[in-house]
Amino acid sequence: MAVPKKRTSRSKKKIRKNVRKGKAYRAAIKAFSLAKSISTGHSKSFYCIVNDDSSGSSESKLTAIDLDDP
């Protein structure tokens, strides 16, 4: 079994910890920004398939998600 020869220094631990926290922070900012754009209706990258049952046909069309409609 591989065993480390020397103890990892505190500064190296802090650097690695801050790198991990930074990656998580950037991922959270990106997710929040994406959620905000979807909720405001300004998203250009999310589409969903909507079945149009009101006309009696089974046609489906591709439309952008609009969360303001009831």
Curated annotation (Swiss-Prot):
Pfam family, one: Ribosomal_L32p
GO biological process terms, semicolon-separated: translation
GO molecular function: structural constituent of ribosome
Keywords, in A-Z order: Chloroplast, Plastid, Ribonucleoprotein, Ribosomal protein
Annotated Gene Ontology cellular component terms: chloroplast; large ribosomal subunit
Biased composition (Polar residues): 52-61
Subcellular location as annotated: Plastid, Chloroplast
Major subcellular site: plastid
Region (Disordered): 1-20, 51-70
Presence of keyword Plastid: yes
Family as reported in the entry's similarity comment: Belongs to the bacterial ribosomal protein bL32 family.
Protein name, as recorded: Large ribosomal subunit protein bL32c
Gene designation per UniProt: rpl32
